[in-house]
Design a protein with these regions (language model features):
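A conserved acidic beta->alpha catalytic loop
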Residues: 11-20, 66-67
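Alpha-helical transmission elements in cytosolic ATPase-linked domains
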Residues: 17, 21-24, 49, 75
Length: 193
């Protein structure tokens, strides 16, 4: 099967050459579009902006550092097209390559948020997922100011199939998620749910 598709890159105020690369891609291929923030507004704002500008029947969220394996997309598309799901989500089965303290805090975060919340957020869940248009529209209808996408994905209640994969090292660059930034993000997630 062949599908029409577009790439929508969200440049979250990067200080490298990301915007130049996005512009070049757009000039070479009109299916490559981009949104460029004036400064870093954070992951949640980038996800929301991308979803808001998306137009497809199916929409995938994935990190551009290739820690979310693009090779899973054909399987994800097949599941949404042939099975009765509105979302195919991914989770890492291991945190191989991560500092042990970071893995410990991530595990504790999921344990705590699932204990105090009415919804379950899968341990190891990534933002990498493929969603139907009705799933995306439902997310966009939530006018949360302080968004926590992993919680919102679960809260909207659509049928989701989970695919597991081994942790993948990033292809280039370094994470901007310091321990403190992750800690504050987890506080936001807990207070949002």
């Amino acid at each position: 099967n062949h599908y029409n598709f577009e790439f929508l890159f969200v440049d979250d105020g990067s200080s490298d050459h990301t915007l130049d690369i996005c512009r070049d891609l757009n000039l070479k291929d009109s299916r490559c579009n981009y949104i460029s923030f004036s400064r870093n507004f954070g992951k949640e704002a980038a996800i929301y902006a991308g979803l808001e500008k998306s137009t497809g029947d199916y929409v995938a969220i994935m990190d551009a550092d290739l820690q979310d394996p693009p090779a899973l997309l054909p399987e994800m598309i097949k599941i949404l097209v042939t099975e009765n799901y509105d979302s195919v989500a991914t989770r890492r089965v291991s945190r191989k390559g991560e500092p042990p303290v970071r893995s410990l805090f991530a595990h504790l975060f999921y344990k705590l948020i699932n204990k105090i919340s009415d919804i379950e957020i899968m341990d190891g869940a990534r933002d990498y997922r493929l969603m139907s248009r009705k799933f995306v529209d439902s997310l966009l209808s939530l006018r949360e100011y302080n968004r926590f996408s992993k919680g919102l994905f679960a809260w909207v209640g659509f049928k989701t199939k989970w695919i597991e994969f081994e942790n993948v090292e990033r292809v280039a660059g370094e994470t901007k998620w310091s321990f403190w930034k992750l800690l504050f993000y987890s506080f936001d997630g807990i207070t949002a749910f």
